[in-house]
């Protein structure tokens, strides 16, 4: 049975493809989820992709990742990244290797987007790579947890 990583997307990410395409691109959430499943699969991992517009439900997803012994978490908490101590605390509480992703470069946008509570609970944070940031995040997470790309030779 494949180890599972959780890919969690927060508020408004269900609107990808139509919401501010000049900022977020034209890819949809379904495109992101396929990219994540394919990338995780390259490492023999399964991606459990979830999205919610509600902070409490995102926290429940994080707790579920812990209960199901997920190997890692990739999270794009959207606007909650900048406001949610509760999401930060949930990520810290479960102690699962986590990578934060943002499609846009949050540091090149409004001042209120420059701070991220969730980044402090992650071992890495990526922003500004578009949806390719998810692929990069899974690559980094796979390296962190020791997952090897299918067909890759393991260094001894």
From Swiss-Prot:
The keyword Amino-acid biosynthesis applies. InterPro entries: DHquinase_II (IPR001874), DHquinase_II_CS (IPR018509), DHquinase_II_sf (IPR036441). Substrate binds at residues 76, 82, 89, 103-104, 113. The record marks 19 as: Transition state stabilizer. Pfam families: DHquinase_II. Pathway: Metabolic intermediate biosynthesis; chorismate biosynthesis; chorismate from D-erythrose 4-phosphate and phosphoenolpyruvate: step 3/7. It comes from the Bacteria. GO terms for biological process: amino acid biosynthetic process; aromatic amino acid family biosynthetic process; chorismate biosynthetic process; quinate catabolic process. Keywords: Amino-acid biosynthesis, Aromatic amino acid biosynthesis, Lyase. One of its GO terms (molecular function) is 3-dehydroquinate dehydratase activity. The active site is at 24 (proton acceptor), 102 (proton donor). It catalyses: 3-dehydroquinate = 3-dehydroshikimate + H2O. Transmembrane segments: none annotated. Gene3D superfamilies: Dehydroquinase, class II. Its EC number is 4.2.1.10. Belongs to the type-II 3-dehydroquinase family. HAMAP family: AroQ (MF_00169). Homododecamer. Catalyzes a trans-dehydration via an enolate intermediate. This is 3-dehydroquinate dehydratase. The lineage of its organism: Bacteria, Pseudomonadati, Pseudomonadota, Alphaproteobacteria, Hyphomicrobiales. The gene is aroQ.
